[in-house]
């Protein structure tokens, strides 16, 4: 049971807390040694802090004294003075590891201590740490020089000096005085009191943090929170009214102290989206005191509220819900407004008028998850018995006496800062911010839209049509445009052609679709100003059709094409600020007439490694990650061991949607693992690297077929035996460009193609996979028949798609197995149409492109017959590195191959592979050695099975029973009975039965081919 107590901070306490006598004698605290303290939080997440507690008879009734060193972001003034307490049953867990950041001078002194136990003794004595009693928390600050940055496996627990490891990090850190006095550190942020930064709160503030507590019907939308030092400097008391003003606007607000501890930077004042919206364009304000005689506002008898142009306001199914939410906003408080005040209202778009028909009008009874915001603006007001009231002055809205009237829409735009801040404040789904320096396509589209806006001022009625195409689904085309619309303060309208219902057999698609468009836009565009209209999947209804094959469909497409172009030109004349954007799989799918109207076409590829790193970094931002768990809100944190660079590398080829799904799976997995220890994790869920890797593997396995995501094989150099001589050539070709790309920035062309040739079974494919694994490269394996297609031009298109996928997934290896079947000598093929010659030509063109835009893409070919390859493939810049992979021609190589193949075997201890291979012929390939080892394992298993039969028979004879083999396995046998140990005799017997796959005559032929190639190079 939680109780509320007065809170006293003490800088002299070390680790334990002290309670007053009445709490000590409370029934719930008797026979308990630990309690948890919950401080009111500005982010809505309760953070329980567990202390070992003791009695202090001198404390006043119902009070607790806690050490200041247990809170890392505690200011020196304006601290919280109340908290909640609850006794903790049981004993705290023992921490396995404590990571402490300490001042470099102390670190150097402790480094001189020869034993780890001596370092532990220092902390035990210096900071009064009691073994198995003192609770250590993340964020603890000891003395002037130590800060606990992480504890494992929990966020708090006791230290056991015989078990707990202490890890020290050498660092320059602030002294405890400065650490506890963030306001003094940032005092100069307010050197100009006429330009104080106005920022938005991250979350609504609970009433327990308001000092003094205001009336229940107080207008909470005008609260502004000030750091202690700024309140003191302005000589303002917490809870008083002040006026924020600048050259644009003036707003009456109520000032409150931003109590410590809190997570806000002390470089501004923090308010609600309502106040921030009034200073939308210039959030720098001056603060002026307001006296009581200035607060005698009249109550309006009638207020007219207009809708701010938004697509939700035009949809009838949301009107009742929006009005209910607006009514509830005014019923819950006595609002203070003025002409022009912008009012944000959140709604759940999953509700509609059909659902609301049977629901009470009190919207508070509806349990919903709001997901979007609509805005209103005060456009007029009337008073009884007052005729000449200042148009800019404030007034009260009393739900009992004020009549509310909603009118038509008005054209207002909000800055991206206000829009995004409001989304975060209300906990609504945000929009990913694409940084223009990392996503060039975003910068290009922004420049085009801005140029169009400037050109429209000089030459109006210029239509602007964009197309974003990608053959990869959910690559982020719509989210890119939505992000741009927010950044440029454009309205955004999203229309999906897949959601348009056409009647079966309808012959007039144009009329249906254009009617749908007009219904969406004609009531919206007059009130929105600059607007991006996105029509998704336009190639679903407007696709290129051969009129000779389907005359009826061709006529429909022609009609829709002409009507849509006329519609766009007409609306561009009426509404000059409109930008029409389309998405499609490829612009080539669209009719030529419509394509000619598209001013700019952008191909959106899956994000590259740098872009994926940016996406993952933002998705893992700890300030935005929260999870609802029952009635509680949990904070999601990322473990320090997470390597974003590794994740960005291994997520090659995945779309932003897939990456977001990976993070959500990892959070869910971490929550499952942590939900039994939430108290000791302080309601924090740490997402570790293992959870993210498991989620990544799951997404890859689930979606690789549909999205074509390449994967990284799990083959290491240890799996490759006898090929160490070729590693240097591979390192030169692949490792050098990856680690030192600057060496190739001066025009020096890098090698990107390697050709493995030699007898079959010598490890060409295995070596290619080992390269991909060793350098963390993605791996595409291409077979010749996969590229062939019966339609003219499609085979060459397949080659282009393979290379484009590789560029999207770089760093990547494209492996052409049996490349002689893909690129034989041109002119020698008897196929009709010369398809193989065209494939070779396309392959040559793509290989030549690797030296320009193919950084990070490497081509590996493997063939048994290099003499059949087109000679152009072997010229510099293509497959210019030829590596012969022959048989193991020394005993050392043969022994290395045997060790690699039996790495996961249990072999007899008396086996010496150097001696074992002494009788093997030099005609064995790697595949032959693999067959030999597999056969030896099979013989060992056969031998073990016979031994088990004998053991069962002996057991039955000795015990007079007749048990089955299954019963013997389940109840009698030991692990040693079932261990399959491969003995020397198994290898020798397998060798006797093995026939080499390559004859001596064939080996001589391959040696001759090698000699010919080496002489010609």
Curated annotation (Swiss-Prot):
Q: Give its E.C. classification number.
A: 3.6.4.-
Q: What is its main location?
A: cytoplasm
Q: Which Pfam families match?
A: AAA, N1_PEX6, PEX6_4th
The record's section on InterPro entries has:
AAA+_ATPase, AAA_ATPase_domain, ATPase_AAA_core, ATPase_AAA_CS, P-loop_NTPase, PEX6_4th_dom, RecA-like_PEX6_r2
Where, subcellularly, is it found? Cytoplasm, Cytosol; Peroxisome membrane
Q: Where does ATP bind?
A: 758-765
Kindly state a single biological-process term from the GO annotations of this entry: fatty acid metabolic process
Coiled-coil region(s): none
Q: Which reaction does it catalyse?
A: ATP + H2O = ADP + phosphate + H(+)
Listed name of the protein:
Peroxisomal ATPase PEX6
* Natural source organism: Candida glabrata (strain ATCC 2001 / BCRC 20586 / JCM 3761 / NBRC 0622 / NRRL Y-65 / CBS 138) (Yeast)
Q: Which gene encodes it?
A: PEX6
